[in-house]
């Protein structure tokens, strides 16, 4: 009985993946693709775009920041969704 209980606990921990964190792209503009694991509790990714004297700028990362008018922001909640 104890063995069955222990097996159920192990299976539950493995299935729930208690240490799960969201993974988002974090490269800027035309840099090579890179990803990062977000801090615990951070469940969204963002893609922020704007234009300046250098041209079109893209910023990616974890979270969903507040932006100023004129900046396009797309937030999403799945793995690597902010490319």
Curated annotation (Swiss-Prot):
Q: Which cysteines are joined by disulfide bonds?
A: 24-45, 38-62, 64-75, 76-81
Q: Which domain of life is it from?
A: Eukaryota
Q: Where in the cell is it found?
A: Secreted
Cellular component, GO, one term? extracellular region
Reported tissue expression: Expressed by the venom gland.
Write out the entry's keywords from A to Z. Acetylcholine receptor inhibiting toxin, Disulfide bond, Ion channel impairing toxin, Neurotoxin, Postsynaptic neurotoxin, Secreted, Signal, Toxin
Query: Predominant location of this chain?
Result: secreted
Keyword Signal included in the entry's annotation: yes
CDD domains, sorted: TFP_snake_toxin
InterPro entries, sorted: Snake_3FTx, Snake_toxin-like_sf, Snake_toxin_con_site, Toxin_cobra-type
Keyword Ligase included in the entry's annotation:
no
Q: Which residues form the signal peptide?
A: 1-21
Entry's Gene Ontology molecular function annotations:
acetylcholine receptor inhibitor activity; ion channel regulator activity; toxin activity
Q: Which family does it belong to?
A: Belongs to the three-finger toxin family. Short-chain subfamily. Type I alpha-neurotoxin sub-subfamily.
Q: Give the protein's function.
A: Binds to muscle nicotinic acetylcholine receptor (nAChR) and inhibit acetylcholine from binding to the receptor, thereby impairing neuromuscular transmission.
Q: What is this protein called?
A: Short neurotoxin II
Q: What organism, scientifically named, is this protein from? A: Laticauda colubrina (Yellow-lipped sea krait)
Upper classification of the source organism reads: Eukaryota, Metazoa, Chordata, Craniata, Vertebrata
């Amino acid at each position: 009985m104890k063995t069955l209980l222990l097996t159920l606990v192990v299976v539950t921990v493995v299935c729930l993946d208690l240490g799960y964190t969201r993974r988002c792209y974090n490269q800027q503009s035309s840099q090579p693709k890179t990803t990062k694991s977000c801090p615990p509790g951070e469940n969204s990714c963002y893609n922020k775009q704007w234009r300046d004297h250098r041209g079109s700028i893209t910023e990616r990362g974890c979270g969903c920041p507040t932006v100023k008018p004129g900046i396009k922001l797309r937030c999403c909640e799945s793995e690597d969704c902010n490319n």
